[in-house]
């Protein structure tokens, strides 16, 4: 029954999209509360986009991890930071961490392409999706909360903007009123803060269990220990550096993306436009925030090694300000050190942002036309066949 209903929704939405392809909807129609994408529809769109992104990006991270592993032996209580602008997680690199190449000696890799070819030949193409998949799957809730929260905040801020700034003559003639870029900026920042705040305690517990293979009883004991030694706020110990890493990126990313849509007069973006705009926006945001990202990556990895992947975490640790860390990095390597890792970061962030936003926008477009079709059907049923 559910399958037939879903197929019916897909057919109805597809027909509505085909009928509307010959005419471009106005901004007033897109912002009409009657046709707005509902939260559950946003969840479905974000979940689909996150899964597609994970499927495409996991091989790149498996290759990156294998290249790092051959440079130095994986040490106990060490970790690395997985971040592509959409998902951000501290991952353990201890001796008990599952390694897809543990069953056979790993060949030497000279680079990304060489690693891709050798891993595919010696271990099978499926091995490129092993190892990091559980981590990526656990990152889906954060991504879903982030994108749904952005859409909700954007709708609320847009309503507030229209309420206090839209002139009566534009309302009477249904004239679109431009939305300032402060709206996507605030929506992106608010959505990211909400997402990392909700997921931070769960992520701390998950990484602790993963690194030490805890049972559920041991997990609750660890939670009690953290609360007793550091208070309830100890569960959010890694929140500040995460927020300081992600908030600038999110604000710049969404502002650039909405700016591109506005500059090209795009109301309902196509898949190709969303893909290109997402890649450009992600690249701009990644480039601008790279110095800050370098500082916060060092801080987050240090936090992971001292507090998450340590059997005896210290109760207190000396803290350094962002300015102090940035100055220290600059003294050691100058400007190149501050922008270190920009190339690999762009290589990951640009496609991840492009895949995620294009998949998300396609899902939104699907449900948008479905809502219009349902509204029209409801009106026809209300008027009756003879009207």
Curated annotation (Swiss-Prot):
Coiled coil: none annotated. It is found in: Mitochondrion inner membrane. Keywords: Membrane, Mitochondrion, Mitochondrion inner membrane, Repeat, Transmembrane, Transmembrane helix, Transport. One of its GO terms (biological process) is mitochondrial transmembrane transport. Belongs to the mitochondrial carrier (TC 2.A.29) family. This is Solute carrier family 25 protein Shawn. Disruption phenotype: Lethality caused by neurodegeneration and synaptic defects. It comes from the Eukaryota.
């Amino acid at each position: 029954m559910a399958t037939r209903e879903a197929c019916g929704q897909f057919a109805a939405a597809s027909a509505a999209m085909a009928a509307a392809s010959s005419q471009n909807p106005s901004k007033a129609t897109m912002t009409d509360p009657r046709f707005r994408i509902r939260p559950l529809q946003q969840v479905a769109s974000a979940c689909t986009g996150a899964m597609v992104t994970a499927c495409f990006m996991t091989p790149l991270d498996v290759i990156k991890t294998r290249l790092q592993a051959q440079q130095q032996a994986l040490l106990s209580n060490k970790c690395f930071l997985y971040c592509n602008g959409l998902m951000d997680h501290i991952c353990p690199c201890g001796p008990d961490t599952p390694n897809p190449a543990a069953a056979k000696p790993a060949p030497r890799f000279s680079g990304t392409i060489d690693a891709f070819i050798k891993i595919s030949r010696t271990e099978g193409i499926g091995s490129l999706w092993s190892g990091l998949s559980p981590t990526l799957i656990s990152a889906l809730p954060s991504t879903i909360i982030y994108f749904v929260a952005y859409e909700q905040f954007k709708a609320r801020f847009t309503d507030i903007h229209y309420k206090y700034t839209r002139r009566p003559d534009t309302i009477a003639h249904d004239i679109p009123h431009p939305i300032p870029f402060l709206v996507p900026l605030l929506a992106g920042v608010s959505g990211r803060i909400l997402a990392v705040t909700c997921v931070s305690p769960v992520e701390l517990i998950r990484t602790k269990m993963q690194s030490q293979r805890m049972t559920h009883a041991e997990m609750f004991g660890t939670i009690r220990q953290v609360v007793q030694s550091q208070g309830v706020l100890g569960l959010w110990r890694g929140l500040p550096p995460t927020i300081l890493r992600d908030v600038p990126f999110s604000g710049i990313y969404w502002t650039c993306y909405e700016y591109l849509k506005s500059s090209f007069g795009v109301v309902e973006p196509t898949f190709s436009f969303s893909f290109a705009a997402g890649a450009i926006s992600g690249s701009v945001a990644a480039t601008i925030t790279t110095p800050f990202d370098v500082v916060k990556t060092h801080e987050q990895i240090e936090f992971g090694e001292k507090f998450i992947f340590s059997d005896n975490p210290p109760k207190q640790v000396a803290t350094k300000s962002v300015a102090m860390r940035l100055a220290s990095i600059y003294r050691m390597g100058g400007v190149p050190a501050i922008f270190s890792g920009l190339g690999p970061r762009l290589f990951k962030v640009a496609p991840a942002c492009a895949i995620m936003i294009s998949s998300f926008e396609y899902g939104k477009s699907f449900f948008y036309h479905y809502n219009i079709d349902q509204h029209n059907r409801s009106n026809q049923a209300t008027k009756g066949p003879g009207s």
